[in-house]
């Protein structure tokens, strides 16, 4: 028995959006597979992490646009003999032009419940992602633009902050929220 255990390294990419006041994550179903998964790629010997992230993202995004995205580390964990590294992919203009290709059967946005029902994320892992999102937005309130559409009403923006659990007394009254937004910008 070999005392040195080797691990593979898998990089998962999370495309996240707030759709109908709920945080959702993009999942894919590859052809010939009967399960959903996150866009991912396996780390090869001479790979750099950014290249692996781009390779995972290229499953659903055209290669031409990959340079316009940022990748932020959420967490990592060991699952049997596989180390999973999780990144959120960000785009300032919130534009994702997803492509269907011959490797994919379907793509979809899953809420917390659907992610748990399909055994994609445990509640603990989903909470880590939500916590990351909250902290990312709290670090700079303008970061909310990474998760919502470019066109939104003041009420939608206000609800988004509240639904993310970013509690600030100014968020609950529209007049105060408007003043707070003006000060932030």
Which role does the model predict for each range below?
Residues 46-50, 123, 171:
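Generic detection of long, well-ordered alpha-helical segments
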Residues 1-37:
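N-terminal strand-loop-strand
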Residues 168-185:
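Charge-enriched amphipathic alpha-helical scaffolds
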Residues 2, 7-11, 24, 50-54, ...:
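Active-site segment of metal-dependent pyrophosphate-handling enzymes
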Residues 88, 97-137, 147-160, 176-178:
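NUDIX/MutT-family hydrolases
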Residues 22-62, 140-153, 158, 162:
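Conserved Nudix-box catalytic region and its N-terminal flanking loop in Nudix hydrolases
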Residues 20, 33, 94-96, 114:
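Generic "edge-of-domain/loop-turn" microfeature
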């Amino acid at each position: 028995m070999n005392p040195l255990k080797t691990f593979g390294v898998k990089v998962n990419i999370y495309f996240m959006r707030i759709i109908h006041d709920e945080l959702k994550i993009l999942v894919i179903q590859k052809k010939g597979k009967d399960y959903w998964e996150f866009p991912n790629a396996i780390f090869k010997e001479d790979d750099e992490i950014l290249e692996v992230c781009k390779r995972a993202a290229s499953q659903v995004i055209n290669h031409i646009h990959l340079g316009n995205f940022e990748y932020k580390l959420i967490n990592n964990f060991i699952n049997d003999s596989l180390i999973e590294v999780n990144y959120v992919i960000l785009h300032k203009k919130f534009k994702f032009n997803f492509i269907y290709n011959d490797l994919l059967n379907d793509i979809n946005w899953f809420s917390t419940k659907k992610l748990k029902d399909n055994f994609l994320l445990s509640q603990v892992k989903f909470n880590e992602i939500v916590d990351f999102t909250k902290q990312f937005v709290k670090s700079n309130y303008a970061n909310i633009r990474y998760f919502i559409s470019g066109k939104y009403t003041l009420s939608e923006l206000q609800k988004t902050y509240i639904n993310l659990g970013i509690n600030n007394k100014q968020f609950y009254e529209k007049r105060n929220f408007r003043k707070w937004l003006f000060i932030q910008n």
